[in-house]
């Protein structure tokens, strides 16, 4: 297995990263242009979200050809140059494999529509009448999870958009096709893979109505998932690659199996439970303040259980589907800098592999779009109409989108203070964040030792410098309040203790360990330290502190 305990991954959403040809869309040459910046940041892998040919109904997660580059992003030669240039700087590329579904424009689906039974078996088609849907399962993007094709008198399953048809992994030919795609990219010099919603690919043989939910309990972590993953990794020859699975509505038990080295499935897992603590009754589109007690409990559960079972966590707050974490759990104004640093430190020093999403390292904020016309995300547009239909006012629906839309993370990267943030010379495909201001740019933070960007560089360097962060055991400390999370990492004689104040109030916490007198390794306030003789410590708003013997 690859050694990934001291590595850090940087996620790039190419469409919004850097536009070099003036069409308003980011491109592969834009990634090449910024490689020196990424090398200086200190990251090891660059995860690129899909750049494959796609009708872009779901921003590239509707793939029409897995072994080509969409001309919008550049050419295969550009990509090969990116692979070479990244490698020359000690960084590997991680590609995003969307294997639960293809675009309905993919040649396989087109052949299926034309009546080719071989290719109909590549997907999940069910015979039926237009007025009798196979099951009551719901799409992740709203509405039914089935689509009727009158010409075929069949329904096809699509857990996401109508243009994203689910693949039939029970068909060995499908699995062989997917292995071939991995081999193709492996031969191009790709060093790592991220598998999109991979725990949804194994569907039950008999599909039935779900009267208790939206159907997910029948297909999440499905009947043959572990068997199929082992086969995919083994036969594609990627056992020694860094691999990460995006796991939708999964459990710790399954993630231990997915990521324990002896299982030979994946290196690590993304789970999203900690990012649902502000979902009212588990509903993404129902807002409520974050439940900090729940957040703490989830971190403790996933860290401790994965450690016990030899599993490995992918540590993250942000990605192309999530709102900006500073807007969500931090503070956009008075404590912008402190809260961004605290949130970064909280996950970077845990047991697992940290992921940074573009712009997170400079504290980028949510989009805050004032009108529906500015949104582009298919999920957001669908749910805007669902919210209105369910009785919300236009103002309420927009407030919900402002907090939850995936477009929050997709606004153009803010390189400098120019009109379009140095992303492009022309109007970008998605409007700039309304929270765009000069201090939230790479240029403003690059040479400032107190900046959020400098703080991220320090965190990345610490993981490489101190084995206790990469390899140490984790345990959690009782702080006496749900607003402060504290944990300890230990490896032999090395130890660090991390304190994180999760909100904008001062909190006095229990702090009576022998480590109180240890040197402060990193903090987000100036010259603060604990009294070696005391038993409590009063934390400033969003304060972060690491003490240690390393």
Residue ranges with predicted function:
Residues 2-183, 187, 200-253, 257-261, ...:
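Acidic/aromatic-lined carbohydrate-recognition and catalytic surfaces
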Residues 15-17, 52-54, 99-100, 163, ...:
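Short, solvent-exposed loop/turn segments at secondary-structure junctions
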Residues 46, 193-195:
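Hydrophobic residues within beta-strands of alpha/beta enzymes
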Residues 312-333:
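Active-site clefts of carbohydrate-active enzymes
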Residues 506-525:
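Beta-strand-rich binding/interaction modules
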Residues 531-550:
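C-terminal beta-strand-rich structural cap/linker in extracellular carbohydrate-active enzymes
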């Amino acid at each position: 297995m690859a050694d990934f305990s001291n590595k850090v991954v940087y996620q790039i959403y190419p469409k919004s990263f850097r536009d070099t040809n003036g069409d308003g869309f980011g491109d592969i040459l834009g990634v090449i242009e910024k490689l020196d910046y990424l090398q200086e940041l200190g990251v090891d892998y660059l995860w690129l979200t899909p750049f494959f040919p796609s009708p872009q109904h779901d921003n590239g997660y509707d793939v029409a050809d897995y072994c080509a580059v969409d001309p919008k992003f550049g050419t295969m030669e550009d990509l090969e140059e990116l692979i070479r240039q990244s490698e020359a700087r000690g960084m590997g590329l991680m590609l995003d494999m969307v294997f639960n579904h293809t675009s309905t424009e993919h040649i396989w689906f087109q052949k299926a529509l034309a009546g080719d039974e071989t290719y109909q078996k590549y997907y999940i088609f069910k015979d039926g009448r237009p007025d009798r849907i196979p099951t009551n399962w719901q799409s992740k993007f709203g509405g039914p999870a089935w689509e009727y094709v009158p010409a075929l008198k069949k329904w096809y399953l699509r857990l996401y958009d109508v243009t994203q048809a689910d693949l039939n992994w029970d068909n060995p030919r499908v699995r062989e096709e997917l292995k071939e795609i991995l081999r193709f990219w492996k031969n191009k010099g790709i060093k790592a893979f991220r598998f999109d919603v991979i725990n949804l690919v194994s569907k039950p043989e008999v599909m039935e109505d779900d009267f208790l939910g939206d159907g997910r309990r029948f297909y999440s972590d499905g009947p043959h998932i572990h068997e199929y993953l082992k086969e995919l990794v083994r036969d594609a020859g990627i056992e020694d690659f860094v691999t990460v699975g995006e796991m939708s509505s999964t459990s710790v038990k399954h993630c231990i199996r997915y990521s324990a080295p002896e299982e030979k499935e994946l290196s690590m897992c993304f789970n999203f439970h900690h990012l649902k603590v502000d979902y009212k009754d588990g509903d993404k589109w129902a807002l409520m303040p974050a439940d900090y007690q729940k957040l703490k409990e989830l971190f403790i559960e996933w860290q401790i259980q994965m450690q016990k079972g030899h599993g490995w966590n992918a540590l993250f707050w942000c990605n192309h589907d999530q709102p900006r974490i500073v807007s969500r759990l931090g503070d956009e104004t008075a404590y912008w800098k402190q809260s961004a640093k605290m949130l970064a430190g909280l996950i970077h020093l845990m047991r697992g592999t940290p992921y940074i999403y573009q712009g997170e390292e400079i504290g980028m904020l949510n989009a805050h779009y004032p009108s529906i016309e500015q949104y582009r995300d298919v999920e957001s547009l669908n749910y805007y109409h669902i919210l209105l239909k369910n009785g919300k006012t236009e103002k309420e629906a927009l407030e919900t989108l402002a907090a939850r839309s995936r477009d929050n993370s997709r606004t153009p990267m803010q390189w400098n203070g120019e009109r379009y943030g140095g992303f492009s010379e022309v109007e970008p495909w998605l409007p700039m964040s309304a929270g765009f201001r000069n201090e939230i740019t790479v240029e403003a933070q690059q040479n400032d030792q107190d900046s959020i960007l400098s703080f991220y560089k320090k965190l990345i360097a610490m993981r490489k410098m101190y084995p206790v962060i990469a390899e140490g055991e984790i345990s959690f400390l009782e702080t006496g309040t749900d607003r402060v999370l504290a944990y300890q990492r230990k490896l032999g004689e090395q130890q660090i203790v991390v304190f994180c104040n999760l909100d904008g109030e001062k909190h006095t916490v229990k702090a009576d360990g022998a480590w109180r007198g240890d040197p402060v390794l990193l903090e987000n306030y100036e010259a603060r330290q604990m009294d070696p003789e005391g038993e409590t410590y009063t934390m400033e708003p969003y304060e972060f502190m690491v003490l240690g013997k390393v």
